[in-house]
Amino acid sequence: MAEQEYDLIVVGSGAGACWAPIRAQEQGLKTLVVEKTELFGGTSALSGGGIWIPLNYDQKTAGIKDDLETAFGYMKRCVRGMATDDRVLAYVETASKMAEYLRQIGIPYRAMAKYADYYPHIEGSRPGGRTMDPVDFNAARLRVTALETMRPGPPGNQLFGRMSISAFEAHSMLSRELKSRFTILGIMLKYFLDYPWRNKTRRDRRMTGGQALVAGLLTAANKARVEMWCNSPLKELVQDASGRVTGVIVERNGQRQQINARRGVLLGAGGFERNQEMRDQYLNKPTRLVDGNPCGRQYGDAHRAGQAWAHTGADGLVLGRAHHGCSQGAGLSRHFRGTLAAGVHGGQRQGAALPQRVRPVSGIPAAMLAENAKGNGGVPAWIVFDASFRAQNPMGPLMPGSAVPDSKVRKSWLNNVYWKGRRWKIWRADRRGRAGLQVSARRMTEYARAGKDLDFDRGGNVFDRYYGDPRLKNPNLGPIEKGPFYAMRLWPGEIGTKGGLLTDREGRVLDTQGRIIEGLYCVGNNSASVMAPAYAGAGSTLGPAMTFAFRAVADMVGKPLPLENPHLLGKTV
């Protein structure tokens, strides 16, 4: 078996995995990235690209006041003791430094001043400014040849499946701002008039979100001369007699190769959402492969490689976590858009309303699973809306009716989407919940007219209102009164799993006794998330992935980052 040697070997090529070798090369380490698939970028390339960064450099520009103790207290309350204080503090202290380094290597971000933290009722939350969105990236900087090796973004995140839109533009459109019409027109004109670029590739020259982040990282990696292999799946980790991880065995060009690592191996290969066996073993039931993220090949290979000696939590406590999302079933959509929009009512099969007060939206599928476990028919649930909503809004995989009328709805979707001219007929889609759904939908319409949700207080906080319709009395409540009426099945799914190998504050993997495994580091969805079961704000996946990669590289080069505020550890909040 052929052997090669590097200082650092990184498994995976998402944001955290791609970020680490750039920093390591700058620090004088010889690095190698091994990617299982034929494309670089992982699920980071499919994401919105946001990062949750307390105390970030753009908060002052956005007019947001923040301080470390407040941010630490908020995050500590969110994780509810399921992540150690020192990891939480390490994240809050280091995230802003990581974001500043991103800016230095040509990947600037801007704070989203109006995008609130996901738990506005928890002390220490902020009404905006902690979530950052990547600045647009010109794909020409990456070159077309390199662009073709990068995973493309999902069509659902683009205008008409082609044109890139930023989080700011998406908010403008969904909020019905007048300027959004001109924004859409400008995006379309710029795309179609860019003949020189469109003759080279169908991809938009203007890259936003996760595409902008990953393209920026790949550009920086090329500049730093990071060696990157695709089609090179991890097969084994190599340990010496003392238990230190000294390298990996990968399969490349049909042959196994051992690659030795002088400083360490960093696992950043994502979650296990494409592995039905692991889903059945660790995730809450029911768990269907079709409701997971359909993109990529997250089979948990790196989880399995380290699981023999790494700490993954008793009884799946750590491995059983996921970034929940709503699914329309049948693999139709990675995201279920519009779940909390005005004019939408969610109901369980027994008729009770879905707990749409649960924030963030990932709380809805978690609540569905909990209700289902009690025998209350929480899975699947139903989303109900009327013709007025359908005409103007996307819902799950459906584009607005003004763009895709009912006659053009794909036949393969018809077992999941129902519509009838009279309201009572749609309840035939699920007879067991018919009466209760009618009552709860009627009550929601009454609340919309009054402008107050007496059940769940939708629209009662800044997070709800961000994507609301300002033309309504309550921006998050709309009536369901104009036929035809629509019902769509709603399944609990996940954008990705976030349970994995347990690490310390430097990203070092711990063994089953809680001791450090020398030479082995882990970040992102490959590790047990510092957010535990929570999601502090938009960007709570990519932010920690890159921040702990930052700390891991510092540890590898012998310059570990000390905690600057140890007096906060153990403090009651």
Curated annotation (Swiss-Prot):
Catalytic activity: a 3-oxosteroid + A = a 3-oxo-Delta(1)-steroid + AH2
Highest taxon above the source species: Bacteria
Pathway: Lipid metabolism; steroid degradation
Cofactors named for this entry: FAD
Membrane topology designation: Peripheral membrane protein
UniProt xrefs under Pfam families: FAD_binding_2 (PF00890)
Annotated FAD binding sites: 7-36
Lipid metabolism as UniProt keyword: yes
Enzyme Commission number: 1.3.99.4
Protein name: 3-oxosteroid 1-dehydrogenase
